[in-house]
Amino acid sequence: LVMPKDERGGYSLYDINAKLNHRFSEQDRLFISFYKGKDHVYYKYKDEDKFKQTHNWGNILLNTRWNHVFTPQLFSNTTLAYNRYVFDIRQEETSSIQQPDGSTIINGSNNLFHSGISDLSISTDFDYHPLPAHNIKFGAKYIYHQFAPEVQTVNQHNSDNGYPQTNDNYSLNNSHIHAHDFSLYAEDDLILNEHWKINAGLHFSFFNVQKQTYLSLQSRLSISFQATSNIILKSSFSQMSQCTQLLSTASLAMPSDLWVPVTRHIRPMKSFQYAVGVYYTGIKNWEFSIEGYYKDMYNVLEYKDGESFLGSSHNWEDKVEMGKGRSFGVEFMAQKTAGLLTGWINYTLSKSDRQFSTDGINN
C-alpha cells in the first residue's frame, strides 16, 4: 500500500522470551520464565493540519515456580508471578486558522486513553497419589489485582502567532480499582473399576473489592464409562463464578478489550455447563469423538447501544448492562494419532445469545 507523501502508517511488534531452570537436588527444582510482548500501530497525516494516532498493547509476565518432592506420592509447586496487560490509544491534532489581520491561530489537542490490569499472585498446588486409583490435587492461591478500566487524559492548547494563549489539562474516568482474590480447591481423579472413572472437585473463592466481599462455592463433576474396548462415554457438570470480565468493542478491529472487575454494583458472572460425549478408537491410529454442551450464564456484561470506552465522560459502570445468556453446540473431531501423517480435523456447530431486561441493548 503506497500512501501520499503527507500520509503515513505502520505496524510493528516484538516478543521476548527467557527461561531458566535449576535443579538444587532430587527433591527441589526452580523454574523462572519471563515474557514481554508489544504491538504498535500508527497513522498520521500532515497538510495545513496535523493528525497522528497510535495504538499500543502488550503483556509482561514474570513467573517463578519451585517444585518440591516430599515423597514419591506427594509433590508441590509453589508459584510467585507478576502479570501486566495494557493498551492505549493516543491522538494528537493540530489545526491552523488564518485570521483577517494576517495572524495565525493554532489549536491543538492531545488525547490519551489507557486501560490495563496488573496481578501479583502466589499459589501452592499439591499433587498426591495415595493409591494407584486415586490422584488427589489441592491448593490455594492469592492474587492482588490492580485494575485501570478507563483512564482518559486530555490536553487542549492554542497559540496566536506563536504566543501561547491557553493550555488546559483534565482527566476523565481516572479510575483505579484494587481487589483481593483468594481461592481454595480440591479434586480427586478416582478409578472405581475397569469401566468407571470419576473426577470430582470443589472450588471456594473470596473476592474483596470496594469494601464489598463476594463468596462462592463451585462444584465440578465428570464421569467416564468404558462401554466397550473401543467406546468411551463421558458426561460432566461444572459450576463457575467469575469476578473479572472482558468488555469487548466490536467497532474496532484491533484489540480493545477492557478487563473489568465486579464492584458494589456489578455482580460476579455465574455459569452452569453440562456436557456429554462419545469417543471411538476402533480404527487403528484413529480417534473419533462427538461432544455436545449446554451452558447457562447470569450477570453477563455488554455495552449499551451506542456506548464504547471512547468519547464519553461516563464511568464504565454506567455504560454497561447486566443480563443473562446461554450457549450450546456440538463438536465433531477426527484425529490421526500415528503413521507418516498425523493431525486432526474439527468441526463445531454452536449458538450463543444474550438477553437483557432493559432497552439499553437490543435483545
Give the ranges of each region predicted by the language model:
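Outer-membrane beta-barrel strand-turn architecture
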Residues: 22-26, 68-74, 128-132, 190-196, ...
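Transmembrane beta-strands of outer-membrane beta-barrel pores
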Residues: 1, 36-40, 82-86, 142-148, ...
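Transmembrane beta-barrel architecture of outer-membrane proteins
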Residues: 13-15, 57-61, 117-122, 179-185, ...
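Gram-negative outer-membrane beta-barrel transporters
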Residues: 193, 294-296, 314-363
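Surface-exposed extracellular loop regions of Gram-negative outer-membrane beta-barrel proteins
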Residues: 40, 86, 151-154, 229-274, ...
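Face-selective signature of the C-terminal outer-membrane beta-barrel domain
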Residues: 21-39, 56-210, 289, 344
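Extracytoplasmic loops and strand-loop junctions of Gram-negative outer membrane beta-barrel proteins
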Residues: 2-4, 14, 44-50, 59-61, ...
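Flexible, surface-exposed loop regions and adjacent strand-edge segments
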Residues: 6, 37-38, 47-53, 93-109, ...
